[in-house]
């Protein structure tokens, strides 16, 4: 699987809230850092628990990809998220190692949600 396919599969798993698929695409020493919320988890199990909590608190969370940039060992994905009747924009930066996501850095405007676009 190339980097584009990896991230497309990963994003699809987020929209399906499929923790098993998400976890299978993480490196064992994955770091998940949401810079906007100042939340950080490290290691496969801690990151899985963190994402499970996100899904628990946002059962209607959905992402749409606005653009996806890929290289040999990284990806950057611009997205719009929607949950609880509001939308916000952000970008994820993914260093890739040995075909797995080694890190997910999230930068978003979640502190400035807006009404959904129709």
Task: For each feature predicted by the language model, list its residue ranges.
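Solvent-exposed, amphipathic alpha-helical segments
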Residues: 5-13
């Amino acid at each position: 699987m190339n980097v584009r396919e990896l991230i497309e599969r990963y994003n699809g798993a987020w929209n399906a809230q499929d923790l098993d698929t998400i976890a299978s695409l993480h490196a064992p020493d994955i770091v998940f850092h949401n810079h906007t919320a100042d939340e950080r988890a490290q290691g496969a199990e801690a990151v899985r628990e963190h994402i499970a909590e996100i899904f628990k608190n946002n059962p209607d969370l959905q992402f749409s990809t606005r653009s996806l940039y890929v290289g040999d060992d990284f990806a950057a994905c611009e997205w719009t998220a929607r949950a609880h009747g509001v939308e916000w924009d952000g970008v994820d930066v993914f260093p890739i190692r040995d075909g797995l996501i080694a890190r997910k850095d999230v930068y978003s405007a979640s502190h400035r949600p807006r009404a959904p676009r129709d």
